[in-house]
From Swiss-Prot:
SAM-dependent MTase C5-type domain: residues covered: 3-311
Lineage: Bacteria, Pseudomonadati, Pseudomonadota, Betaproteobacteria, Neisseriales
Name recorded for this polypeptide: Type II methyltransferase M.NgoMIV
CDD domains xref list: Cyt_C5_DNA_methylase
Any one GO molecular-function label of the UniProt entry: DNA binding
UniProt entry keywords in alphabetical sequence: DNA-binding, Methyltransferase, Restriction system, S-adenosyl-L-methionine, Transferase
Active-site residues per Swiss-Prot or TrEMBL entry: C74
GO biological process, one term: negative regulation of gene expression via chromosomal CpG island methylation
Annotated gene: ngoMIVM
Length: 312
């Protein structure tokens, strides 16, 4: 049985890849960033990638899909920004509601940052839930941690899953994996030691924990950094910064803290090594930093399919 999905704000394909692994076939993926669109086409030439503003996309012709998914922009709700919420012009939740009305999917899955669960956005969350309820969906909000699903990174993300009433009772959130994910040291040791860098073993010991959260930052400074400014970080000492530069040339006697390459950051985000990224280094790092870890999308996607099959 084939399950179809339409994805908005597809980015570099983290969510799309996870949903594909779960069993969804994408009828279309809408993304406004040219380099991210090229990344999608590079990895899946057969995907119907539509480059453009989702606000100009019309859902007619895609009615009857099984899933409407997307990672709508996070700046309106991110603590790194002004948290303007619904007053931010980048808020695309209204577009997701519009497309749900136009395409009438059986299920909806939208992803955003943890900040959306802040008390200041409670009324807006209720508004979103109510708007989908008017279309015949019962929605749930849930905070998930990527580390619970095999990713070597905490990365808390908010998921909104809504299903048509006939499927609602069959949906259950995915259970965390029983095994702990690899530490960053274990995950990246082969890449760190591939040039016979003598400090690789010591680096592995220092990196013997999972990562906090990879964050996309503005160009010309750092593009990815460890988000250790959170008051709950307890002053962890291993603050690493990834700068926009070439792939690190680690001399055998190098003793400093090496920068993380594009491939390393992608692996931390849960992408497979054969997933390629298009563009210069700044766009590539940004694509990775903004991505939804594929293993998390896969875990939720599998549960949605079970609900659509009425298996749970």
């Amino acid at each position: 049985m084939q399950f179809t999905s339409l994805e908005i704000c597809a980015g570099a394909g983290g969510q799309a890849l996870g949903l594909e692994r779960a069993g969804f076939s994408h009828v279309a993926l809408i993304e406004i960033e040219p380099s991210a669109c090229q990344t999608l086409r590079l990895n899946r030439p057969d995907w119907n990638v539509i480059e453009g503003d989702v606000r100009l996309f019309q859902g007619e012709g895609y009615d009857g899909i099984d899933l409407l998914a997307g990672g709508v922009p996070c700046p309106p709700f991110s603590k790194a920004g002004k948290q303007l919420g619904k007053d931010d012009e980048r808020d695309l939740f209204p577009e997701a509601i519009r497309l749900a009305k136009e395409t009438d999917p059986k299920a909806i899955m939208l992803e955003n940052v943890r900040g959306l669960l802040d008390p200041k956005f409670e009324n807006y969350r209720n508004h979103i839930t109510e708007q989908f309820a008017k279309l015949g969906y019962l929605g749930q909000w849930k905070l998930l941690y990527a580390a619970d699903y095999g990713v070597s990174q905490l990365r808390p993300r908010v998921l909104f899953v809504a299903l048509k009433n006939e499927y609602t009772n069959f949906f259950k959130w995915p259970e965390p994996n029983s095994e702990q994910p690899k530490t960053v040291g274990e995950l990246l040791f082969d890449l760190m030691s591939e040039n016979n860098w003598q400090g690789a073993h010591n680096w592995r010991l220092k990196a013997a924990q999972i990562a906090p959260t990879l964050v996309a930052v503005q160009k010309n400074t750092a593009v990815l950094t460890w988000d250790l400014h959170d008051p709950n970080a307890h002053g962890r000492s291993w603050v690493w910064m990834v700068q926009v530069c070439g792939i690190v040339r680690r001399l055998k006697t190098f003793t400093g803290m090496p920068r993380l390459t594009v491939r390393m950051t992608a692996r931390i985000q849960g992408f497979p090594d054969d997933w390629q990224f298009f563009g210069k280094k700044t766009p590539m790092y940004r694509q990775i930093g903004n991505a939804f870890p594929p293993p998390v999308a896969e875990a939720v996607g599998r549960q949605i399919i079970k609900a659509l099959k009425k298996e749970n």
